[in-house]
Structures are given as C-alpha cells and as structure tokens.
Amino acid sequence: MKIVLASNNPGKLAELVPLFAPLGVELIAQSDLGVPESPEPHRTFVENALIKARNAAQHTGLAAIADDAGLCVDAMGGLPGVDTAYYCTQFGYDKTDYNNRRAVLEQMQGQTNRRAALVSTIVAVRSVQDPEPLIASGRVVAELTREPVGEHGFGFDPVMFIPSLG
C-alpha cells in the first residue's frame, strides 16, 4: 500500500518511513509526486492538517497523512499556535528554529507563568472525499526555560523543561 505524506519536510519522512515499513506501507513524500504545498489558512491545527491531507489525496489519488503542530504558550493566550513556524518573522527575524525560540523567549521576558504545550495533530484520509478522516492529537506540557539548554533536539525542544522528567 502507498500513502502520500503531505509534507515537504525531509525530517518527518525520515522519522515516519521506518514506522510504516513493517506494516507493508510505502510512505511517499508529496514533493516526489509533484504535489504543490497546501495553504494553511485556518486557525486550528486539525483544520490545517485536514486541508493538507485532502490536497495531497486530491493530487495523487492516494491515501494521505498530514500533520500540523505548534507551540501554545499559556501566558501568550495560546500563541504562537498555528503560526509557530513563522512566529519570528513578525519581529523581523528570518524563519529558523533558532529565531522562533529567540522570539518566544524575548516575548516571555518577565513572565512567571512559563507553562506551554507542544501540540501535534495528525490527520489521515483514504481519499479526498473521505467522510471519516482519522484524527489524532497529542500534547506535551512543559515549562519554557529562560534560555536554550542541551545540545540535542530541534524546534522548541531546547527551551522545554518537563519537571516530572527532570
């Protein structure tokens, strides 16, 4: 069985291919099939993931999997949320993980409530018209550190501390 991954992120493909292979599923990047990147016009993770999955299914005729994820900071009213990937650009920074972390930490200066959640929503559709998309959401709640810690991880990993894990 072939499923298209509605993402142009090579890191996501590298993580997911080994998970699907034992199931006899060949996961193919949408870019390998000429699928244009989908817009993400919605204000929720689930709506954006669904539109991306349907876009990939429409262009390929294959089942599709998509995700949308971001950082939701309590003291910032849930922001940056669905705008996480581009959050730093509103402050004049280039779009990079480093600059996104920098922008969030700058906005959090002086805040005592540092609770935040990394949220990820994954949607799978069997076809573009699938009336029952499979939707899964997860969240990891942590405290934002005041500066990056450690040498591993990507995205917001270096500024997230989970007290129960030390």
Locations of regions flagged by a protein language model:
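Anionic-ligand binding patches
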Residues: 1-4, 10-166
